[in-house]
Structures are given as C-alpha cells and as structure tokens.
A protein has these predicted regions:
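Positively charged n-region of N-terminal signal peptides that target proteins for export
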Residues: 1-5
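Sec-dependent N-terminal signal peptides
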Residues: 6-13
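C-terminal motif of bacterial Sec signal peptides marking the signal peptidase cleavage site
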Residues: 19-21
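Bacterial signal peptide processing site
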Residues: 23-25
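Short Gly/Thr-rich strand-loop-strand
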Residues: 36-54, 84-131, 151-156
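Secretory pathway targeting signatures of secreted, lumenal, and periplasmic proteins
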Residues: 44-76
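A short acidic-to-branched-hydrophobic micro-motif
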Residues: 66-88, 137
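Short, exposed beta-strand-loop hairpins at the edges of beta-sheets
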Residues: 125-143
Length: 156
C-alpha cells in the first residue's frame, strides 16, 4: 500500500510538471531588438538575408559575430510559426546527425517555443524557436558559458 502511494505521488508530480511546462511561454525578440542587444554585448551584426533570398519563407536573417572571440549567433525571422517549426525541426535533425558516442543534450518546450541543446565533439549547439523566430548557434564548446549568457539576455 505504501509503495502504491509513493508511486502515485511520483506520477502525480511528473504529470503536474509536464502540464505546467507546456503552459510556459517566452517573449519573442524582433530583428531590431536582436541587433540592438547583440551590438550592446560586443557583437558585430550583419544582415544575412541576401544569403537566403531564394527562400521566401525567411523574412529576416541577422548574423552576430563576437568582436573578441569570433563565434557567431544567428537569428532568423520566418514568415509564420509553421515555417519556423519546420526550420527548427530540420536544423534539429542536422544537429542530431552530428552526435558522437559522447554527447549531452537537453530539450524543452512550452506554449510558443521549442529548445534543443547538444554538446558533442567539442561543439556546443543551441536551437531555440519562439513563435516565428529561431536562434541558431553552432560554436566551439569553449564558448559555451559566454553564449549561454547571451541566450539568457535574449530570453531564449
């Protein structure tokens, strides 16, 4: 009887945690806000839209390169949420295909976002979709702590 109560309590907590996790939402960042925040954080931001002109579902692209360390953070604004979900899914699959024997990964999702983090083969990869925007990061693991501060400041 005691084991059943403990098991029920555990299942109840997991269920509540799962349900509340799905109701969490994030505020999306606009292209202008991304440029401003990244510039203030010592990044050089360039408009990368010309590299994606043939993709009509991509509205805006900004590439932010850290002035001192040289790693890059990419920000995409897509036509709508469905395109962003597809873009996220395709890039997540690419990240997953790069897994080596030793890796760590984390996934989370909420009402309007999905996030995937993978560390493998000395690379740190982060993909976050919030509504119709996607933050894409594929850098050397040595910059992990620095880029996590950037991600946190963006709210992604």
């Amino acid at each position: 009887m005691k084991k059943k109560l403990v098991l029920f309590g555990l299942i109840f907590r997991v269920t509540i945690f799962s349900l509340t996790g799905c109701s969490i939402s994030k505020n999306k960042v606009t292209g202008d806000a991304f440029k401003n925040q990244m510039t203030a954080a010592n990044f050089t931001v360039v408009d990368g839209k010309s590299q994606f002109e043939r993709y009509d579902y991509i509205s805006e692209v900004y590439l932010a390169r850290h002035k001192e360390y040289g790693y890059q953070v990419e920000f995409y604004v897509l036509k709508d949420k469905e395109y962003a979900k597809s873009f996220y899914s395709n890039n997540k699959n690419l990240f997953e295909s790069s897994k080596t024997k030793t890796y760590t990964e984390a996934k989370s999702s909420g009402k309007n976002y999905d996030k995937f983090v993978l560390e493998t083969n000395n690379k740190y990869k982060v993909l976050t979709r919030v509504e119709n925007t996607v933050l894409y990061i594929n850098i050397d693991s040595k910059y992990k702590e620095k880029v996590n501060k950037v991600i946190k400041n963006l709210g992604y």
